[in-house]
Design a protein with these regions (language model features):
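Residues that scaffold the ATP/ADP-binding catalytic core of kinase and kinase-like folds
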Residues: 84, 166, 361-364, 500
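Cysteine-centered catalytic environments shared across enzyme families
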Residues: 1-326, 338, 342, 524-525, ...
């Protein structure tokens, strides 16, 4: 695990520029650094040593020194691929997974990507042909950004902040991303909040040659339900697949720990992993605290649990630092709790296992129950439901109103992913300049087309796998772990596990009363039934309550009345939204937090820097 940076474009001070970019991501790799500069190419890497502690240094070269690679991540089938490549005549100088990329690219070219099992971004510079080849893993576990300026220079790296050290980077806000963010609570799609900066999307490669940039998808995850097996058979297959995946994800030359919340995902993983240490965070308020459960469960499986309770003061004091590490604004309040659990874990281990991906693969979100509730309402003709929904949208928010509004639209219109904080009408009221380049449905539509003809839950899962998981779940997992120089591994997000999960029918995933049906059944083979059936809190955070406390609401109010807030928002509307929440008239906490996090992020990148 590490961080990578680089650029293509000859300059007199390339070494100094590259070092500045590397320094910006030093937190990703405190164990060492490496550089390669030749002609117009500059590659840099910061290393967190996990496998082959002495021999895995980067940049790494092939036998004839023609290819140079920098790599962020882990290839879990590297031993199998090493053996295959050695049989084909390749000679290995190390026992690291990095070297597999060099020989694999020599042997198979771009087709190598179909063989890799792991989390990765990498860049290979072909010295002979002066070509740059980069790729991102199948699910987008590791981040990769790129930027091409008017002079044709290409900048790339694990974090956008590294670009600030390059004189060819022009820092400009992409204000068109703001309306999308206000719906999603994260920055969705390939565009970012920085003009010209793009994300290399999951399962895509990028190639640069003679100033020309080509970006292409190499793999597409797709659900293909199979009704031929029983629930018990699916449970057995999940159990076997997860045991194998967890063991593959434990390969390391350093100690591995595991995160532990009160939910089935992390409990199941901790029990399968047989690690010595688990890590949990919570709050003094018992409603938002999982530490007692974690310590009890850790005793049950015979491991030591390290629990930490976050105070409100330190939660709020670290918001700026956290938004800085995110690179783009993220309004997921759990990201702060994730920062602290990574911080505490990094004091004990270098690698932690975590449960990301289980909800998207196995049907874990409560909203997936929606198609099974009040099904009679869907039998009412759509034009009538639309009319009822339009009227309901004008009424005060009381129990049941949101249901009428949502069910007044077809699924592809109402479901843009796991979050939908604000509709276009509300955004128009709040924003001074409402000029969206894209609407949320423009981003979700391709995934409904991909899953066309499938049931509603499968369509929702497809949407979340490609939007919510990449834009929120995996963003915060990577940025919060790397901010603390900790490698986070996600055994659920494995190609072999997905190959299985993609065929599990919805009836074995979700019904009106339960989520992750088959996965919970598989977990019961390893952990107590009461744990397997437990509802996940998911790093719960008491932000709703804090925003009704003047001590913390006052911090938000101050931000809502800054010049930055005036620049983008109608501050009268912002203050009214906050007043409604404080008084209890409306529950606006998620919308308030979304705007507040944007302002905190903007302050970090466009006011302070």
């Amino acid at each position: 695990m590490c961080g990578i940076v680089g650029f293509v474009g000859a300059r007199a001070d390339m070494q100094e520029i590259l070092q500045g970019m590397m320094d910006a991501i030093a937190h990703r790799g405190p164990d060492g650094q490496g550089q390669f500069i030749e002609g117009q190419a500059a590659l840099g890497q910061r290393r967190l040593s996990i496998i082959d502690l002495e021999g895995g240094k980067q940049p790494m070269f092939n036998e004839d020194q023609n290819l140079a690679v920098i790599f962020n991540g882990e290839i879990y089938n590297f031993q199998e691929l090493t053996a295959e490549l050695m049989r084909a005549g390749h000679t290995f100088a190390t026992r690291s997974d990095t070297e597999v990329l060099l020989h694999g690219y020599e042997q198979w070219g771009k087709e190598m990507l179909q063989k890799l099992r792991g989390m990765f971004t990498f860049a290979i510079w072909d010295r002979k042909n002066e070509t740059l080849f980069c790729a991102r893993d199948h699910f987008g576990i590791k981040p990769f950004y790129y930027y091409q300026n008017d002079a044709g220079e290409l900048l790339f790296g694990s974090e956008i902040k590294s670009f600030l050290a390059h004189p060819g980077f022009k820092k400009e806000l992409n204000e068109e991303q703001l309306p999308l963010y206000l719906s999603y609570q994260y920055s969705p799609g390939e565009d970012t909040f920085f003009k010209g900066v793009k994300k290399l999307m999951p399962a895509h490669w990028l190639e640069w040659k003679a100033g020309q940039l080509t970006v292409q998808r190499y793999w597409q995850p797709k659900f293909d339900p199979d009704d031929s097996r029983t629930l018990e058979e699916w449970e057995d297959e999940i159990s076997a697949a997860m045991k194998e995946s967890v063991q593959a994800h434990k390969i390391a030359d350093v100690e591995v720990g595991s995160f532990l919340s009160s939910g089935v995902d992390s409990s199941y993983m901790a029990a399968l992993a047989h690690v010595d240490k688990t890590f949990t965070v919570g709050f003094a308020n018992k409603q938002y605290d999982e530490t007692d459960y974690a310590q009890e469960f850790s005793k049950h499986i015979g491991v030591k649990n390290y629990a930490y309770r976050i105070t409100p003061e330190e939660y709020w004091a670290n918001l700026g630092k956290i938004q800085y590490h995110m690179d783009e604004p993220l309004a997921d309040a759990a990201s702060v709790a994730l920062y602290f659990v990574n911080r505490e874990a990094s004091k004990q281990v270098k690698v932690c296992l975590s449960g990301e991906g289980a909800d998207e693969f196995f049907g874990g979100y409560n909203i997936y129950k929606e198609p099974f509730t009040v099904t009679w309402y869907d039998k009412i003709p759509l034009p009538i439901r639309r009319a009822i929904g339009a009227v309901a949208d004008l009424l005060p928010p009381v129990h049941g109103i949101n249901f009428l509004v949502r069910r007044g639209k077809p699924l592809a219109e109402r479901y843009i992913g796991n979050t939908n904080l604000m509709d276009e009408h509300r955004k128009k009221k709040l924003l001074k300049n409402y000029h969206p380049g894209k609407l949320p449905t423009d981003l979700s539509r391709p995934y409904f087309e991909l899953s066309k003809g499938q049931d509603a839950v499968t369509q929702m899962e497809t949407c979340d796998l490609n939007l919510w998981m990449v834009g929120d779940i995996l963003l915060k997992a990577d940025k919060m772990s790397m901010a603390n120089s900790l490698e986070l591994r996600v055994p659920f997000l494995d190609r072999k596990v997905f190959e299985l999960a993609s065929h599990i029918p919805t009836k074995c995933k979700v019904n009106a009363n339960q989520t992750k049906i088959a996965m919970r059944g598989a977990a019961e083979k390893t952990i107590p039934a009461k744990t397997a059936d437990k509802k996940k809190l998911g790093f719960p955070v008491p932000v709703r309550a804090w925003l009704r406390d003047e001590q913390y609401a006052g911090i938000v109010r101050k931000a809502f009345n800054t010049p930055a807030a005036e620049q983008f928002f109608r501050t009268k509307e912002l203050n009214a939204m906050l007043d409604q929440h404080i008084s209890g008239k409306r529950d606006n906490w998620r919308q308030i937090w979304c705007i507040f996090m944007f302002l905190v992020w903007y302050d970090e990148y466009f006011v302070k820097r």
